[in-house]
Amino acid sequence: MAKPTKKPPLPPGVDADILADLMKWAKAAGADSAEAFYVHGESLSVAQRLGKREKLEGSEGRDLRLRAFVGKCSASVSSTDFAPKALRTLVERAVDMARAVPEDPYAGLAPAELLATNWPELDLDDKRRPPSARTLLALAAEAEDAARSVKGVTNSEGAEASWSRSTMMLVTSNGFSGGYRRGGYSLSCAVLAGEGTAMERDYEWSSAVHFDDLMAPAKVGRNAGRFAVGRLNPKKVSNARVPVVYDRRLAGGMLGHLAGAINGRGVARGTSFLKDRMGQQIFAKGIRIVDNPHRQRGLGSRPFDGEGLPTKRRAVIDDGVLTTWLLDLASARQLKLAPTGNGSQGSPSNFYLEKGKLSPDALIADIKSGLYITDLIGFGVNGVTGDYSRGASGFWIENGKKAWPVSGLTIAGNLKDMFLNLTPANDLQFKSSTNAPTVRIEGMTIAGS
């Protein structure tokens, strides 16, 4: 059970009183209201290729963004200079700019009664000492060595390991003050199999908030090598209309299209293909898609949103029915709805499709002829109409089994139909902020080459 806290940690390197002073200075300069967002970030990244170090990059910096409101006009400015004189100049510039821009009828801070006053502890920082470059390089080396040991791997694009930590704090002139720290680790490897023009490339990666949740480097490497070798000697296929199965490495992208379509700003502008579908069946019965900002150690977790509003778990698709938009303050006001704690810009948090009942093997067992996709190319998705067309490669399914690799295909459909004809497997993993298990979609069009 998450434990609520009322006192956010002070960001390192800055006194929280400075942010409170900014609010006072903004009011004194003529602003009706204001908000300040502070970020202190640190990162370290290393990469190696064929056993030799290729990259070592580290950074540390602070950034402050101030947004001032004069009536229904607002302006945002940012600075990395925290000297008092520079901050006062920043305030004056923000207020002057706000006076000069057109009015936005939907602009403004959240009412004080809606602001978050307590929030859960989400375990977003493992509090380890920052890893050294040598430690990260050892992770990358282990991953690449494991990949190159896979029979059939002939070359490497390298392996990369990185660490980051960010401390964020938000203060508003009407009483909100909150902050939290987020850590992150990532490891990736990409290799080639085969020779000459018959080479094939693939990869594996892992990201986590805690180091202990990162995939073992040797497994990252072995997977990358195995995936690349499995793509060798692809065949072409003829045009067809068949079931298409998306490997779970790709299936989260389908949810990305959904998140874009239910973003309140697009709905308010009338540019979403789902704009008229609230409360309707857009997936099959039994399908549930969740936005959960309170997932422990979640890569998209957040105790409050970018506008100081409380966050909570929501089933945006429940039993196949669309139940909510993802709303920040501006889009909520425009649509005359309550905000959902997805500010700013209506972005999701940990967005995932709940797992189904069948294993991936069982999901394809009754497919006489079909396509199992392991890679997608291009971005041919129209968010206004839902039309979908992308290049693809993967494996041909024959009599319920992955039979041989295929490439040079184009798959096409419309997201409205694809959503309705989607069936999830039971292999959900949380590898990013948007996740889905392997999914099967009936009746997609395939064009060979």
Where do the PLM segments sit?
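Dual-mode signal for accessory low-complexity, basic/Gly-rich regions
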Residues: R277-S449
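Active-site bordering "gate/hinge" segments
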Residues: M1-R302, G306-L309, D318-V321, K401, ...
